[in-house]
């Protein structure tokens, strides 16, 4: 029987999925994750020593009534650590559950200056984009007097001290550069 043919009421259950060339073989790869994320599939973790029985929705009526009497499995809870899960699925699941917020760095003198000047530049030039604002603020910073720049350096020292009190064990750890292709 062709697995793509329409089934009639007395049709036997197709066991095409036991064939190594079965069309759903592709779901054993990363494509499965996309199907799960888009709601076109689901992930079930099968513990070692168990074999899942997959029955297409079009054939599930064969299990109703007095036909094939399969024992109804009872749900069992497992933690992810107890299951053999493909790495690409486990990695994406752990991202959601273990996402920790990074401690913000204390602002330096230029950041404080830029924050203040950014708003005033946007008020005076509403059509200006962020790239142009950055260039203008950088130019303005280089042309500022030592007194003005010292004021911002003192402000940054104050923020650094506040940051030290809030996060006593903080140590700046820059992110590693990813390899460019």
Curated annotation (Swiss-Prot):
<keyword id="KW-0206">Cytoskeleton</keyword>
<dbReference type="GO" id="GO:0090575">
    <property type="term" value="C:RNA polymerase II transcription regulator complex"/>
</dbReference>
<keyword id="KW-0804">Transcription</keyword>
<comment type="function">
    <text>Mating type proteins are sequence specific DNA-binding proteins that act as master switches in yeast differentiation by controlling gene expression in a cell type-specific fashion. Positive regulator of MFM genes. The HMG box recognizes the DNA sequence 5'-AACAAAG-3'. Required for conjugation and efficient meiosis.</text>
</comment>
<keyword id="KW-0539">Nucleus</keyword>
<keyword id="KW-0346">Stress response</keyword>
<dbReference type="GO" id="GO:0010514">
    <property type="term" value="P:induction of conjugation with cellular fusion"/>
</dbReference>
<keyword id="KW-0805">Transcription regulation</keyword>
<dbReference type="InterPro" id="IPR050140">
    <property type="entry name" value="SRY-related_HMG-box_TF-like"/>
</dbReference>
<dbReference type="GO" id="GO:0045944">
    <property type="term" value="P:positive regulation of transcription by RNA polymerase II"/>
</dbReference>
<dbReference type="GO" id="GO:0001228">
    <property type="term" value="F:DNA-binding transcription activator activity, RNA polymerase II-specific"/>
</dbReference>
<dbReference type="GO" id="GO:0000978">
    <property type="term" value="F:RNA polymerase II cis-regulatory region sequence-specific DNA binding"/>
</dbReference>
<dbReference type="GO" id="GO:0005737">
    <property type="term" value="C:cytoplasm"/>
</dbReference>
<dbReference type="GO" id="GO:0030154">
    <property type="term" value="P:cell differentiation"/>
</dbReference>
<keyword id="KW-0238">DNA-binding</keyword>
<dbReference type="GO" id="GO:0044377">
    <property type="term" value="F:RNA polymerase II cis-regulatory region sequence-specific DNA binding, bending"/>
</dbReference>
<dbReference type="GO" id="GO:0000785">
    <property type="term" value="C:chromatin"/>
</dbReference>
<protein>
    <recommendedName>
        <fullName>Mating-type M-specific polypeptide Mc</fullName>
    </recommendedName>
</protein>
<dbReference type="GO" id="GO:1900237">
    <property type="term" value="P:positive regulation of induction of conjugation with cellular fusion"/>
</dbReference>
<dbReference type="GO" id="GO:0051446">
    <property type="term" value="P:positive regulation of meiotic cell cycle"/>
</dbReference>
<dbReference type="GO" id="GO:0007531">
    <property type="term" value="P:mating type determination"/>
</dbReference>
<dbReference type="GO" id="GO:0005634">
    <property type="term" value="C:nucleus"/>
</dbReference>
<dbReference type="InterPro" id="IPR036910">
    <property type="entry name" value="HMG_box_dom_sf"/>
</dbReference>
<dbReference type="GO" id="GO:0005816">
    <property type="term" value="C:spindle pole body"/>
</dbReference>
<dbReference type="InterPro" id="IPR009071">
    <property type="entry name" value="HMG_box_dom"/>
</dbReference>
<dbReference type="GO" id="GO:0003713">
    <property type="term" value="F:transcription coactivator activity"/>
</dbReference>
<keyword id="KW-0963">Cytoplasm</keyword>
<feature type="DNA-binding region" description="HMG box">
    <location>
        <begin position="103"/>
        <end position="171"/>
    </location>
</feature>
<dbReference type="Pfam" id="PF00505">
    <property type="entry name" value="HMG_box"/>
</dbReference>
<dbReference type="GO" id="GO:0044374">
    <property type="term" value="F:sequence-specific DNA binding, bending"/>
</dbReference>
């Amino acid at each position: 029987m062709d697995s793509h043919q329409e089934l009639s009421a007395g049709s036997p259950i197709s066991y095409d999925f036991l064939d190594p060339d079965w069309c759903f073989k592709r779901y054993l790869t990363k494509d499965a994750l996309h199907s799960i994320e888009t709601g076109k599939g689901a992930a079930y973790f099968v513990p070692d020593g168990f074999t899942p029985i997959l029955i297409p929705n079009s054939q599930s009526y064969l299990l109703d009534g007095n036909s094939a009497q399969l024992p109804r499995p009872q749900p069992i809870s497992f933690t992810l650590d107890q299951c053999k899960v493909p790495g690409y699925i486990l990695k994406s699941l752990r991202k959601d559950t273990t996402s920790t917020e990074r401690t913000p760095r204390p602002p330096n003198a230029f950041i404080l200056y830029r924050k203040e000047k950014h708003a005033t530049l946007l008020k005076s030039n509403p059509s200006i984009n962020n790239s142009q604002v950055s260039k203008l603020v950088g130019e303005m910073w280089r042309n500022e007097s030592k007194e003005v720049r010292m004021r911002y350096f003192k402000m940054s020292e104050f923020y650094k001290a506040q940051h030290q009190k809030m996060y006593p064990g903080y140590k700046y750890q820059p992110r590693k550069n990813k390899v460019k292709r």
